[in-house]
Swiss-Prot record:
Cellular localization per UniProt: Mitochondrion matrix
UniProt KW Ribosomal protein keyword: no
Effects seen without this gene: Increases frequency of mitochondrial genome loss. Cells show a slight decrease of succinate dehydrogenase (SDH). Cells lacking BOL1 and BOL3 display defects in a subset of mitochondrial [4Fe-4S] enzymes.
InterPro entries linked to this entry: BolA, BolA-like_sf, Mt_Fe-S_assembly_factor
Function according to Swiss-Prot or TrEMBL: Acts as a mitochondrial iron-sulfur (Fe-S) cluster assembly factor that facilitates [4Fe-4S] cluster insertion into a subset of mitochondrial proteins such as lipoyl synthase (LS) and succinate dehydrogenase (SDH). Required during the last step of iron-sulfur protein assembly when the iron-sulfur cluster is inserted into the target protein. Acts together with NFU1, later than BOL1 and GRX5 in the [4Fe-4S] cluster insertion process. Not required for [2Fe-2S] cluster insertion into mitochondrial proteins.
Name of the protein: BolA-like protein 3
Lineage, opening ranks: Eukaryota, Fungi, Dikarya, Ascomycota, Saccharomycotina
Length: 118
């Protein structure tokens, strides 16, 4: 089907829904973009309690703040099972988690070799 030129001219780029991967969504490029207030609040809580080597928090809900992916490496996890590590993070974020739809949590024990980053 061929569209008439007048119809093609009336379609504006702002009405096109670009795939997320092409728009630089936070899901793919969060380290290059500023953190949302919620991401910053979560990061601050985790840094205060766990003093992590690595602490990455991403809003993976498309920006509505209902689902987060958290990747954290801390010395405070040394000697703890994976379940205990997750329970510790859940305890720190208990009040926040109650408002969320979901959480993707990755925890790792510190090797003591990595630079601090967030």
């Amino acid at each position: 089907m061929k569209l008439p030129q007048t119809m093609l001219r009336s379609i504006s780029v702002k009405h096109v829904r670009w795939p997320r991967i092409l728009t630089g969504s936070k899901l793919w490029y969060s380290t290059q973009m500023a953190m949302t207030p919620e991401e910053k609040m979560i990061t601050d809580k985790l840094q205060q309690e766990l003093e992590p080597e690595v602490c990455k928090v991403q809003d993976v809900s498309g920006g509505c703040g209902s689902m987060f992916a958290i990747n954290i490496t801390s010395k405070k996890f040394n000697g703890l099972s994976l379940i205990k590590q997750h329970q510790l993070v859940n305890r720190i974020l208990r009040d926040d988690i109650s408002r969320w739809h979901g959480l993707q949590l990755t925890t790792k024990k510190s090797t003591g070799k990595g630079p601090a980053s967030s």
